[in-house]
Amino acid sequence: MIKRNLKHPLFGKQKLMLLLSFIICIAGNTSAQQPIRVVVAGLNHDHIHGILSQYNKGVVDIVGIAEPDTRLHKKYRDIYHLPDSLFFTDLKKLVLLKKPAAVLGYNAVANHVDIVEICAPLGIPVMVEKPLAATLAQAKRIEKLAGKYHIKVLTNYETTWYASYRDVYNMIRSDSIGLIKKMVAHDGHQGPKEIGCSPDFLHWLTDPILNGAGALNDFGCYGADLMTWLMQGKKPIAVTAVTRHYKPAIYPKVDDDATIIIEYENATGLIEASWNWPFGIKDLEVFGEHGYLHALDKENISSRMRENRKGSKVAEPLIAPINDPLIYLTAVLQNKIPGTDDQSSLQYNMIVMEILDAAKRSAASGKRIVL
């Protein structure tokens, strides 16, 4: 029997090398898991609560918040116990000082272009809350700046992180229902005022200039984005839309309901966007040549095949980096994923803006708009 000499110098060196390798591995993993350094632009979007909660949990490193309204500084400082040093009124001064990895927009949709005007020449990527812009003209300006200065401009949609939607997409790509023939998206809720949105959020959300429209922009963008994704970036050939004003006393300036028909060469999309649903809804139906898929919510899917075989399933949880906007953003900036042909990409969201612009023109004129 050979006895191992624990005091042999070679064994000591091996232990040292193993220990060093372990330390390097741990250090590398720790570095890889460091939260992304961001600047937040704007505090008048109610989605801000999500990112500030993540900051307090250490999920994201917010190095500064730029908001011209100091009243909102105090509001969110008190709610989330934030230091005064985090707040600024000037975005350009803040990003020059802190040099963040990205800027996250939580301001009025019409002001997204202002963020890009500041960040693009400085080479700083931007992610905004949906939709990309209030108007197609603003979106084209964003696209031009992003191209000129070679930055990423991404758009965050809640539904991008729905496991059920990703599962439906994957099943379609695997030819489980044949070619897409019809897509139906229902999105909305009882109304922003009815569900308790803050006055600062309501101020711009119900303004035709600051939001670009009412429910048409607010919730029509979801269906337009999903259909662009399902059609793999194909542009539609025509758009027809009807908007309604069911609650003029509450929303005097903008539509509160929109129905949008999107025509593709061999498929049709129907978007039903409203502030008049009896409950909050985000679901997606896809009819194929020989089957039907319905993402009922974030997780649950029902199906029906031509032979009348019915089924249901719970989608598997999404895995990184397509399971969370911050993880996704980090992966794009690290060139681990392209961010050029998905729901968040600028390429797809320019098509979204073309659809929304055509829908507004169609609703105003009563005509089918050919793209």
Task: Identify the function of each model-found stretch.
Residues 141-159, 179-181:
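Rossmann-fold dehydrogenase core element
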Residues 17-27:
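Bacterial N-terminal signal peptides
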Residues 26-81:
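N-terminal Rossmann-like dinucleotide-binding module
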Residues 80-145:
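Beta-loop-alpha module in the N-terminal Rossmann-like domain of NAD(P)-dependent dehydrogenases
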Residues 225-300, 327-338, 358-359:
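Contiguous beta-strand/loop segments that form the cofactor/metal-binding neighborhood of enzyme cores
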Residues 102-104, 331-371:
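C-terminal helix-rich "cap/oligomerization" subdomain common to oxidoreductases
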Residues 2-18:
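Bacterial N-terminal signal peptides that target proteins for export
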Residues 162-242, 246-250, 366:
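Predominantly a Rossmann-like dinucleotide-binding segment in NAD(P)-dependent oxidoreductases
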